């Protein structure tokens, strides 16, 4: 395949990339208003060191914990047979149904002892590990056991075999998961604010809320952007260059699932049961508890208010997910099939944007809509654009995993027959990666249903979503009033999670 993409594809990815530059432009413009002397004072004060330490510790610990837990769970479930396996294959995806800020307030309502560093790390890890479990599990299902058999036949130990024969094949899934989880932890707001853990994002929100100081908030965001650039470079180095599809003759030989001994089955069952109880059991039980015994339930509003919040969440999330996936497709296709500096950097631009807190992205859209498109201010259109900016990397990660597993030989055949690249993509490539497209849509839709920060700022007072309703009531310690909205959010989020597990990651 040629390294230079077709002109129409180049133009398309540039048009997609242009609006992604707005938040960067906003951050630079507002950060320069602080002035050099004031910037030095802010960046080198003790408070900044504390925020940097807290943010980096949260990102590193949660990423390591979520990747380790997700990979270990995927390996056990794909390689071994034990009682309860079928249930836990589904149960390990269910934490995606529960927003991190909902988990936070349910744990806080149970015990205030979680308002410590390790409590925050634990809750965020339990909320994030399915983002590693799903893609790693999908790759383990498709691995050829020939490499492992060759390694073992040469006298290598199982540990050596896993490290040098299996783990390199998991690099794409693990690398994408590291990037996704790490960047998400950099900008997490709802859960860490409920758990009273101070990070750059909470400081940015406080600067805006208490002093309406957009310039200082932009300066703090610039620090996050610098950290993000390092993470993106690290992910590119970690991923490396390797062929991920089966290119030889013959068929892939799947792994044989082994049955564990009774003692090991008991240990494995206990391990998965503990994860299920901590990640799903406690939040759901506490929601039901507050629904039954809470005294603030009457503050939740009538059924019409509840229905309005649900319909707003569904419509905005659906449109946002559709736009995001449609824009992610050409970016990923260009980066994977037409590797060049232009396609790679436009493909990585959304990941850099992911390090900008949703609050700052929302502020940039408020600024540009007020000054240049006042009629669009506080409309669904601006919210959908914000969603596209926030969750484009999530769609890219899922689509990339599908496209990299597809050999480009079929596209070369189409090209040799004189077909143009768009026809080849529409008739050959797209149908082959439809499960990945469905996975991307479901994953983005799921996260948009739970999105809080940008939605808080961009919606007008007469527009309420499920996540906003939960936030408003929990901020006033009205846990019972928040429960109906939180339960609806959890139950409805189960639909895309079911689709992800059943059709996309298999």
Curated annotation (Swiss-Prot):
An example GO biological process term is: iron ion transport
- Enumerate the transmembrane spans: 9-29, 57-77, 90-110, 116-136, 174-194, 218-238, 275-295, 314-334, 350-370, 379-399, 428-448, 480-500
Consequence when changing residue 116 to G: In strain: TN106
Q: Name one Pfam family in it.
A: BPD_transp_1
All copies of domain ABC transmembrane type-1, residue ranges: 52-233, 310-500
UniProt superkingdom: Bacteria
**Which membrane topology term applies here?**
Multi-pass membrane protein
> Keywords on this record?
Cell inner membrane, Cell membrane, Ion transport, Iron, Iron transport, Membrane, Repeat, Transmembrane, Transmembrane helix, Transport
**CDD domains assigned to the protein according to its UniProt record, in alphabetical order:** TM_PBP2
Which compartments does it reside in? Cell inner membrane
| InterPro entries to which the protein is assigned, alphabetical | MetI-like, MetI-like_sf
Q: Which GO terms describe its cellular component?
A: plasma membrane
Tell me the function of this protein: Part of the ABC transporter complex FbpABC (TC 3.A.1.10.1) involved in Fe(3+) ions import. Probably responsible for the translocation of the substrate across the membrane.
Q: Which family does it belong to?
A: Belongs to the binding-protein-dependent transport system permease family. FbpB subfamily.
Record note on quaternary structure: The complex is composed of two ATP-binding proteins (FbpC), two transmembrane proteins (FbpB) and a solute-binding protein (FbpA).
Designated name of the protein: Fe(3+)-transport system permease protein FbpB 2
What gene is it encoded by?
fbpB2
């Amino acid at each position: 395949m040629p390294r230079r993409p077709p002109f129409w594809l180049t133009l398309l990815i540039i048009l997609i990339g242009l609006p992604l530059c707005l938040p960067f432009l906003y951050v630079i413009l507002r950060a320069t208003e602080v002035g050099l002397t004031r910037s030095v004072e802010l960046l080198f004060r003790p408070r900044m060191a504390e925020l940097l330490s807290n943010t980096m510790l949260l990102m590193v610990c949660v990423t390591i914990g979520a990747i380790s837990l997700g990979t270990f769970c995927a390996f056990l479930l794909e390689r071994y047979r034990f009682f309860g396996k079928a249930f836990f294959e589904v149960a390990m995806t269910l934490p995606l149904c529960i927003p991190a800020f909902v988990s936070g307030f349910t744990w806080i309502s149970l015990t205030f002892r979680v308002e410590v560093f390790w409590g925050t790390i634990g809750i965020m890890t339990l909320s994030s590990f399915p983002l590693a479990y799903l893609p790693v599990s999908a790759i383990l299902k498709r691995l050829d056991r020939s490499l492992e058999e060759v390694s073992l036949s040469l006298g290598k130990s199982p540990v050596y075999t896993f490290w040098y024969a299996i783990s390199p094949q998991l690099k794409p899934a693990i690398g994408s998961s590291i990037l996704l989880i790490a960047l998400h932890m950099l900008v997490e707001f709802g859960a860490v604010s409920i758990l009273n853990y101070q990070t750059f994002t909470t400081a940015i929100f406080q600067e805006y809320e208490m002093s309406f100081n957009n310039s200082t908030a932009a300066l703090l965001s610039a620090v996050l952007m610098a950290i993000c650039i390092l993470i993106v470079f690290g992910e590119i180095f970690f991923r490396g260059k390797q062929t991920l599809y089966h290119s030889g003759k013959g068929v892939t030989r799947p792994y044989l699932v082994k049955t564990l001994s009774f003692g090991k089955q008991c240990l494995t069952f206990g391990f998965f049961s503990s994860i299920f109880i901590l990640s799903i059991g406690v939040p759901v039980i506490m929601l039901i508890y507050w629904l039954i015994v809470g005294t603030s339930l009457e503050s939740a509003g009538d059924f019409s208010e509840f229905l309005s919040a649900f319909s707003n969440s569904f419509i905005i999330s659906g449109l946002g997910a559709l736009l995001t996936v449609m824009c992610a497709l050409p970016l990923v296709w260009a980066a994977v099939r037409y590797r060049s500096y232009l396609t790679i950097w436009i493909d990585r631009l959304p990941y850099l944007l992911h390090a900008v807190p949703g609050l700052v992205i929302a502020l940039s859209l408020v600024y540009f809509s007020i000054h240049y498109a006042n009629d669009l201010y506080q409309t669904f259109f601006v919210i959908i654009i914000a969603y596209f900016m926030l969750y484009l990397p999530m769609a890219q990660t899922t689509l990339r995993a599908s496209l990299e597993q597809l050999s480009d030989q079929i596209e070369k055949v189409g090209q040799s027959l004189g077909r143009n690249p768009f026809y080849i993509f529409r008739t050959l490539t797209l149908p082959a990666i439809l499960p990945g497209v469905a996975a991307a849509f479901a994953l983005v839709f799921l996260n948009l249903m739970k999105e809080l920060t940008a939605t808080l700022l961009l919606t007008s007072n007469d527009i309420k979503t499920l996540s906003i309703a939960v936030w408003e009531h929990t901020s006033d310690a009205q846990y019972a009033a928040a429960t109906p909205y939180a339960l609806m959010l959890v139950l409805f989020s189960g639909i895309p999670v079911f689709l992800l597990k059943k059709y996309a990651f298999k």
